[in-house]
Curated annotation (Swiss-Prot):
Residues 1-20 form the signal peptide. Keywords: Signal. The lineage of its organism: Bacteria, Pseudomonadati, Pseudomonadota, Gammaproteobacteria, Enterobacterales. This is UPF0319 protein YccT. It comes from Salmonella typhimurium (strain LT2 / SGSC1412 / ATCC 700720). It comes from the Bacteria. NCBIfam families: CrliSynInhib (NF047712), PRK03641.1 (NF002967). Belongs to the UPF0319 family.
Amino acid sequence: MKTGALATFLALCLPVTVFATTLRLSNEVDLLVLDGKKVSSSLLRGAESIELENGPHQLVFRVEKTIRLPGNEERLYISPPLVISFDTQLISQVNFQLPRLENEREASHFNAAPRLALLDGDAMPIPVKLDILAITSTAKVVDYEIETERYNKSAKRASLPQFATMMADDSTLLSDVSELDTVPPQSQTLTEQRLKYWFRLADPQTRHHFLQWAEKQPPS
C-alpha cells in the first residue's frame, strides 16, 4: 500500500465506537499483548495512552527500569512477562502504579513475587488478577501472542478464555463495529487489519504523529 493511500486509509479508520476508558501508558512498562493481540510497538512508541472499550481487558507486559548496582554502576532490569486482567466497566481511566525498584534486591523480590497496582482516575485501586506468563517456547524470538493464547486456555489466575478463542480468527480484530464482520477482500492483508486495529486504539496525538511519519515515507 502506498504511503499516501495508507495515511488516507488510516484517517478513515478513526473510531466510530465511543471508547470510555483511557489506559495511561508508563515508560517503565513494555506492553506486549493487549486482549490477546500482539501490540504494534512501532505505532504505539511514544504514545501516552490508548483508548479501550468498557469491559474486561488483559495486558501482557514487562517492567523495564534502570536499577543501581554496587560501585555506582547501573543496568537495565527487565522483569519476566506478566499477565494482568481487570474490568473497566465503570472506569474511565487506568494508571499503572509500580512498586519501588531501585536495586538488585528489590528486582529479585519482584521477580519472585511481582506486585503492582492499577489505579483509576481518582487514584483508587482497581481489582486485578496478576500472574507471571511462563514461556514454554524454546525459540530465540518469543511469540507472546501464542504464549498468551496458551495461557488463556489453561485456567490460570489471570486467564481470560474469551481472548484465547479470539486468536483463532483475526476477523475479530475490529470486533464490535468491524468492517471485518464480513469476509475481507484478499487485498486486505492481516498486516493491514492489525495496523488499523492499533491505529484505532491510539490516542489522537499518536495518530497525528504516525500519519505525519507515514506521509514522509517513500512509496513502495
